[in-house]
Curated annotation (Swiss-Prot):
Matches recorded under CDD domains: HATPase_MutL-MLH-PMS-like, MutL_Trans
GO cellular component, one term: mismatch repair complex
One example of a Gene Ontology biological process annotation: mismatch repair
Gene: mutL
Protein name, UniProt field: DNA mismatch repair protein MutL
PANTHER family named among the record's database cross-references: DNA MISMATCH REPAIR PROTEIN MLH, PMS, MUTL, DNA MISMATCH REPAIR PROTEIN MLH1
Coiled coil location: none
Organism: Halothermothrix orenii (strain H 168 / OCM 544 / DSM 9562)
Function text: This protein is involved in the repair of mismatches in DNA. It is required for dam-dependent methyl-directed DNA mismatch repair. May act as a 'molecular matchmaker', a protein that promotes the formation of a stable complex between two or more DNA-binding proteins in an ATP-dependent manner without itself being part of a final effector complex.
Pfam family, one: MutL_C
Family: Belongs to the DNA mismatch repair MutL/HexB family.
Length: 644
């Protein structure tokens, strides 16, 4: 049996450091929090190669006395608590006394620190946790820590670090949250010699949001200041017409500490329930101020997760506070458009995807109900009314200006559709699975053996949403949005693989503001975006100018679509392969570009939809897997009528 031995201090420190120092961002977080606890109002963070080569944090805080600087690197040495009861009234960000010791044990660390009462600073170097040198030097009041060669003595841990871009993203997220929690502190983040984030330190949260996320977001927020019982909720929340398609913009602080807790997300999302499209999330920056005894920050090694003793009450307070602020916006046109995007007749519609992405109608469509509201002219550049593309035999797509066809009936039957038997493939559509397309390998190719069209003639529409058609064996109900989405999707995939996507220049270029990590991701995808029809140019530190977009995107939704495409890139950047991600974006754009529920089609347009649908590789499911066609057989009709 192996003999039980006490581990050497250096080994114990390296093992313990694994809980505190997971990656470069962990180092940045601990050092910045020490700077904040030291009363700093100016903090410089300098990073090289995502923090793998160098991390520097310099502040103007109160500094460390020269006779305490070595003790500061002993494990469990801290100035923030003295006994266990202090944990229940904790006001500092750090308290365990593990951070400096853990960081020093897995790196080469230099520290220069000076207090106000000292005439000279003290400079000390540590390697693997051991003091190598210590000497006086000249420096201003505050602390300057430089960490080099992180994990130099633990190569197994270094091997698991991600790419420079990924590691920098984590660092930027840390600094973003600390800056939002402390708007009175001037933060500067430099990566590879370039300033990527800088906050003004004015003490105003909205100024900080503007500096990090840009003007558009800052102007789309409303202030919240609510107190109930022992909890105060303050910060900013988004109007219902401004949202994102992931939760990464729901940012919470408890007593100015950035935290994660699902109860906070639920409180926010329940307050916005019914106000946002399906799959959309609000943008919130909320700080909860409550008695420290009601929150346990010691449940996670990195202190990013917390536990509440009154979680249900906290959720209710958040929800009530947001509800009150949103209710004040009831008379705002921006809010009304989001709460009631559909006409009165649309209330009974299925809660399907096309409602989520319904766009504002043109004035002509609203005022002239007898006109064709669906097919508009496609022009270049995008300075005309919105366009909807439909298939034609000649060139794959055609566009048409509003016609004067009455909605009460279709035009005379145009016998363009073939009267054929139902294809066996249709009978097997229940076994169909959602497309899995390898874009890089051009797996979508033209269907040489065109499917027979199992439909004789178009009869009409139901609620301007479903095409009703007669076939050789009963009735066919076709979802016009899903059908058009399938047509656009296959055309887009084929054109993408052949680099044939048509772009249209914007009369007024769209400015997109991003955070520093978003900018890094976006730059890496610029070639793929250009191939998809988006022409973006870097414009400033973390902003881009969109000069061209794919022709199928409607003019009035340009900025929204581009923003949502970027959100999808950021959300799935690491979760999907590049080909899968591009496929996801093309599916999304096809959905946004397709005819919507509630749009009137004349008979010819409905026929064109059906004809184009059966030229695709799979006319029975849209790219997201939703059904396109419902078949009611003649036998089913006869049975329902009591004839069988």
């Amino acid at each position: 049996m192996p003999e039980i031995k006490r581990l050497p201090e250096s080994v114990a420190n390296q093992i313990s450091a694994g809980e505190v120092v997971e990656r470069p961002a962990s180092v940045v977080k601990e050092l910045v929090e020490n700077s904040l606890d030291a009363g700093s109002n100016k903090i410089l963070i300098e990073i090289e190669n995502g923090g793998k080569d160098l991390i520097r944090v310099k502040d103007n805080g109160h500094g460390i006395p020269s006779d305490e600087i070595e003790i500061a690197f002993d494990r469990y040495a801290t100035s923030k608590i003295t006994d266990i009861n202090d944990l229940y009234s904790l006001k500092s960000l750090g308290f365990r006394g593990e951070a400096l010791a853990s960081i020093a044990s897995v790196s080469i660390l230099d520290i220069i620190s000076r207090t106000k009462s000292q005439t000279k600073a003290i400079k000390m170097r540590l390697k693997g946790g051991k003091v190598i040198s210590k000497e006086p030097c000249g420096a201003s009041v505050g602390t300057d820590i430089i960490v080099k060669d992180l994990f130099f003595n633990t190569p197994a841990r270094y091997k698991y670090l991600k790419t420079t871009r990924n590691e920098f993203k984590h660092i930027s997220n840390i600094i973003t949250r600390e800056a939002l929690a402390y708007p009175g502190v001037n933060f500067t983040l430099i990566h590879n010699g370039r300033i990527v984030l800088k906050t003004p330190g004015t003490g105003k949260t909205l100024d900080c949001i503007y500096a990090i996320y840009g003007k558009e977001m800052a102007q789309s927020l409303v202030k919240i200041d609510y107190e109930d019982r022992y909890i105060k909720v303050s910060g900013y929340i988004s109007r219902p017409d401004y949202y994102r398609y992931n939760r990464s913009y729901e940012i919470f602080f408890v007593n100015k500490r950035a935290v994660h807790n699902s109860i906070l997300n639920r409180g926010v999302e329940e307050a916005y329930q019914g106000l946002l499209p399906p799959g959309a999330y609000p943008v919130v920056f909320l700080n909860l101020k409550l008695n420290p005894i009601l929150v346990d920050v010691n449940v996670h090694p990195t202190k990013k997760e917390v536990k509440f003793s009154r979680d249900k009450v906290i959720k209710e307070v958040i929800q009530n506070g947001i509800n009150i602020e949103l209710s004040k916006l009831d008379k705002s046109p921006r809010l009304k458009r989001n709460i009631n995007p559909l006409n009165r007749d649309d209330k009974t519609k299925d809660k399907s995807e096309y409602q989520k992405i319904k766009l504002p109608e043109d004035k002509e469509q609203i005022t002239n109900k007898s006109s064709d509201a669906g097919i508009l002219k496609n022009q270049n550049p995008l300075d005309s009314q919105d366009s909807i593309l439909l298939p034609s035999k000649k060139n794959g797509f055609y566009s048409k200006k509003n016609s004067q066809v009455s909605q009460n009936k279709f035009m005379d039957i145009n016998n363009k559709l073939e009267k054929t038997e139902i294809n066996d493939n249709y009978k097997k559509d229940k076994h169909y699975k959602t497309d899995s397309i390898n874009i890089k390998d051009n797996s979508i190719k033209e269907n040489k053996n065109k499917m027979d069209i199992p439909i004789k003639r178009v009869l009409g529409q139901i609620k301007n949403t479903y095409i009703i058609a007669e076939g050789r064996d009963g009735l066919y109900i076709i979802d016009q949005h899903n059908a058009h989405e399938r047509i656009l999707y296959q055309s887009f995939i084929e054109k993408y693989n052949n680099s044939e996507i048509v772009s249209q220049p914007l009369v007024v270029p769209v400015n997109i503001e991003t955070t520093a990590p978003e900018a890094e991701v976006l730059k890496s995808y610029l070639p793929q975006l250009e191939k998809m029809g988006f022409k973006l140019e870097v414009f400033g530190i973390n902003s881009f100018i969109v000069r061209e977009v794919p022709s199928l995107i409607k003019k009035r939704s340009n900025k929204r679509v581009v923003r949502e495409v970027i959100d999808k890139l950021l959300e799935h950047d690491k979760a999907m392969k590049p080909s899968e991600l591009i496929n996801e974006i093309i599916s999304y754009m096809s959905c946004r570009g397709a005819i919507k529920a509630g749009e009137y089609l004349d008979k010819k347009e409905a026929e064109q939809i059906i004809e184009g649908l059966f030229k695709t590789d799979n006319p029975y499911r849209c790219p997201h897997g939703r059904p396109i066609i419902i078949h009611i057989t003649e036998d089913d009709i006869n049975k329902g009528m009591g004839r069988k």
